[in-house]
């Protein structure tokens, strides 16, 4: 489990903008990284759309939003185009960042346990420190909660 006030683990993943995203090269700003199970599913679509609606407000606070799932770049591009998502989505097919950030683990649904992506959001400051984690996220109003927290710490 990732801890608040710890150094953000470094990773490099392919991005929907056809470039690699390296966390250590993006620390000139706050980063709101959200891990989600799958493109084009109801909860994940709502979460992406909610962050997209508030994207300009995050940008005004010098915060970039990044979504990460195991989906391919091709899937991410279709998802971005379909729902007009203004931020990058990263493909973590090998579960590099998912595991480093504790977003991969045991889940349960309808009484069955299985391994999967746990909906998680991490807020990182420009010094590379994790300042807040949200685990087992409920989508409704989550993006507003992240934005409000960011406003409090700036």
Describe the residue ranges of each PLM region:
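Chalcogenol-based redox active-site neighborhoods
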Residues: 1-154
